[in-house]
From Swiss-Prot:
A matching Pfam family: Gp_dh_N
Additional observations: Plants contain three types of GAPDH: NAD-dependent cytosolic forms which participate in glycolysis, NAD-dependent chloroplastic forms which participate in plastidic glycolysis and NADP-dependent chloroplastic forms which participate in the photosynthetic reductive pentose phosphate pathway (Calvin-Benson cycle). All the forms are encoded by distinct genes.
GO molecular function: glyceraldehyde-3-phosphate dehydrogenase (NADP+) (phosphorylating) activity; mRNA binding; NAD binding; NADP binding; salicylic acid binding
Subcellular location as annotated: Plastid, Chloroplast stroma
Keyword hit for Thylakoid: no
Reactions this protein catalyses: D-glyceraldehyde 3-phosphate + phosphate + NADP(+) = (2R)-3-phospho-glyceroyl phosphate + NADPH + H(+)
Record protein name field: Glyceraldehyde-3-phosphate dehydrogenase GAPA2, chloroplastic
Similarity-based family: Belongs to the glyceraldehyde-3-phosphate dehydrogenase family.
EC number in record: 1.2.1.13
Gene3D superfamilies: Dihydrodipicolinate Reductase, domain 2 (3.30.360.10), NAD(P)-binding Rossmann-like Domain (3.40.50.720)
Active site, renumbered: 216
Site (Activates thiol group during catalysis): 243
UniProt main location, coarse: plastid
Length: 399
């Protein structure tokens, strides 16, 4: 039997471009402040594209759409920070539904253990509103979406960030309350259309009243899986996401429907399920049944990393795989995919705007058809940037 060959990517080979650094939010006082105008401009161009006879044309938004945030937790607050950092946004956030009240909403938006202090003037405005750099955002509090004043406030789009109302019946309560559309910041259940920016968001139709932005892990996985499948043809594969713990876990051992997640999050590596790999088929239908995976929740508060191993139909080697990623990152996936040549660790990817960053030195090919790819992602900030992008697409295709 012939021995299998093994190749590991060497970033310095063949004149590959050097990693130019992560894009950091200006909201971070401790981060290196570099201009993200190129990123924002590119995304603005992408999200302003409208379908027209199978092609695209620049969209024009005559008026901002009114946006409500339902659930002001990790994603809700990250979304607001991301939106606040965008210039000329077609979105107007006018109300937040949060059971904690104005004082808590204001404090937790301003001071964040992961993001640091928000570089904005944030304060309560009376007993029922929040002020962010003078922008007044109303605060309401009701656990039943059907009771929310969306009709009275003229809400066009609800950012559903509770993680609870993820099916048509649940998310549909926002429509019953008078909202026109709902964007779920989690995997949707049932037949809810799922979109991943950079992968299939161009298929969005204004006729969709409830849509899903998929999960943070699917947003990381799908862009580079799309590249792998287009360039080399994926036969099958498995994925493991080493994922920071989330609010769904227990700080100390306590009851939970998942016995593993019942254990102390900061003390354990917690194996659990994830539908992220299978969900890729929702945005790349030709991969249905070809991918599966698990999650390992680890004692870090933010930033996660995907480890994908796939068998491909076209023979290849590590440098060729990385070259395909670099090409996509400079072209169709610019602002969505990045490639890193530096020997970094998880904290270095905090507040990275992109959906996934390929760790080029860890790309491997076993034999010539088994490919291993490692990709980093900020499971809160990067994901929230895509929620803003998808909301922009909704706004720029408004009729």
């Amino acid at each position: 039997m012939a021995s299998a060959t093994f190749s590991v990517a060497k970033p310095s080979l063949q004149g590959f471009s050097e990693f130019s650094g992560l894009r950091n939010s200006s909201a971070l006082p401790f981060a290196k402040r570099s201009s993200s105008d190129e990123f924002v401009s590119f995304v603005s161009f992408q999200t302003s594209a409208m379908r027209s006879n199978g092609g695209y044309r620049k969209g024009v938004t005559e008026a901002k759409i009114k946006v409500a945030i339902n659930g002001f937790g990790r994603i809700g607050r990250n979304f607001l920070r991301c939106w606040h950092g965008r210039k000329d946004s077609p979105l107007d956030v006018v109300v937040i539904n949060d059971t904690g009240g104005v004082k808590q909403a204001s404090h937790l938006l301003k001071y964040d253990s992961t993001l640091g202090i928000f570089d904005a003037d944030v304060k309560p405005s009376g007993d029922s509103a929040l002020s962010v750099d003078g922008k007044i955002i109303k605060i309401v509090s009701d656990r039943n979406p059907s009771n929310l004043p969306w009709g009275e406030l003229g809400i066009d789009l609800v950012i559903e960030g509770t993680g609870v109302f993820v099916d048509r019946d649940g998310a549909g309560k926002h429509l019953q309350a008078g909202a026109k559309k709902v964007l779920i910041t989690a995997p949707g259940k049932g037949d809810i259309p799922t979109y991943v920016v950079g992968v299939n968001a161009e298929l969005y139709s204004h006729e969709d009243t409830i849509i899903s932005n998929a999960s943070c892990t699917t947003n990381c996985l799908a862009p580079f899986v799309k590249v792998l499948d287009q360039k080399f043809g994926i036969i099958k594969g498995t994925m493991t996401t080493t994922h920071s713990y989330t609010g769904d876990q227990r700080l100390l051992d306590a009851s939970h429907r998942d016995l593993r997640r019942a254990r102390a999050a900061a003390l354990n590596i917690v194996p659990t399920s994830t539908g992220a790999a299978k969900a890729v088929a929702l945005v790349l239908p030709n991969l249905k049944g070809k991918l599966n995976g698990i999650a390992l929740r680890v004692p870090t508060p933010n930033v996660s990393v995907v480890d994908l191993v796939v068998q491909v139909s076209k023979k290849t080697f590590a440098e060729e795989v990385n070259a395909a990623f670099r090409d996509a990152a400079e072209k169709e996936l610019k602002g969505i995919l990045d490639v890193c040549d530096e020997p970094l660790v998880s904290v270095d990817f905090r507040c990275s705007d992109v959906s996934s960053t390929i760790d080029s030195s860890l790309t491997m090919v076993m034999g010539d058809d088994m490919v291993k790819v490692i990709a980093w992602y900020d499971n809160e900030w990067g994901y929230s940037q895509r929620v803003v992008d998808l909301a922009d697409i909704v706004a720029n295709n408004w009729k």
